[in-house]
Amino acid sequence: MGIHHLFKKGRPVISFEIFPPKQTSTIDTIYDTLDGLYDLKPDFISVTYSAGGKGASDHVTCDIASIIQNKYHITPLAHLTCVNSTKEEILQNLKRLQENQIENILALRGDIRPDVEPKHDFEHASDL
């Protein structure tokens, strides 16, 4: 379901935002968090790309959004950042999201990492 439909229901919309686990953790660590959030019955859960552009690899946001949608039956909102991605990487991420039937995407510029030269295919989220 498109998240915009939730705001037409005439009631407050409840959502949560989660961060993918760092590289030192496995995706399994997210289940405890999702189990607790499920009990609160949110309308949707957004999944960040990763704080500061560090941490999880690019597929983890999609993997978690897919788990939210298919295991917990909650609408996911996947973040998609562009400042540290090439056009090809963005297209791969969009294809992965589409293959997993993730309909809601929040386009963001993302954080510039001081230790990584930014890629210049997309300077701003509006370029996506």
Residue ranges and their predicted role:
Residues M1-F16:
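N-terminal amphipathic alpha-helix/helix-capping segment at the start of soluble metabolic enzymes
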Residues D32-T48:
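Catalytic domains of carbohydrate-active enzymes, especially glycoside hydrolases
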Residues I14-P20, I45-V47, P76-L80, I105-A107:
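Hydrophobic faces of well-ordered beta-strands that scaffold small-molecule active sites
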Residues K9-V13, K41-F44, Y72-P76, Q101-E103:
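Short, well-ordered coil/turn segments that N-cap beta-strands
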Residues P21, D43-C62, D111-H120:
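Glycine-rich, proline-tolerant flexible connector loops at the mouths of alpha/beta enzymes
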Residues G55-H79, E123-L128:
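Alpha-helix-loop-beta-strand connector modules within alpha/beta enzyme cores
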Residues N104-L128:
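Conserved anion-binding
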Residues S25-T29, C82-R96, D127:
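Glycine-rich anion/phosphate-binding loops
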